[in-house]
């Protein structure tokens, strides 16, 4: 005895036939009989995902509002920057528990000097750091100042400050 499916609306139910009759039954069996072409196409499209619900890629508005990877910082400050709380659940829980908001990253001495060299505060964004670097390099470049030694030293200090901030993950 061999199983043969009863039909589309009777899944899990089978007729029991001998081998010869199963072959004959299967030749004439059509799972999509009684369905229009558009219904068959819809079934085939849904079968790609196993008939599970799907959503269009990129429609989540919160996916666009977060900082880009290049704007995030490293360490615990980076983890805080990447965390999103669109409904305010975490901030409400912190307010109820009396715990303060997470602290900003404490600058090391060289990092603070680097920000000072670029003329920026510790809360400067990646874009601010890059803009200040670009302006100062143009201003103090030896070709722009006729080879002035004082300007050349400032030029080196600006480059070193930017490289330090870049290595520290600020830009």
Curated annotation (Swiss-Prot):
Disulfide bonds: none
Region of interest called Disordered, as start-end residue ranges on this chain: 56-83
InterPro entries tied to this protein: DjlA_DnaK_co-chaperone, DnaJ_domain, J_dom_sf
Domain J: 113-170
Domain of life from the UniProt record: Bacteria
Pfam families referenced in this protein's UniProt entry, alphabetically: DnaJ (PF00226)
Comp. bias regions, Polar residues: 57-77
Record PANTHER family: CO-CHAPERONE PROTEIN DJLA
Name of the protein in its database record: Uncharacterized 19.0 kDa protein in cobS 5'region
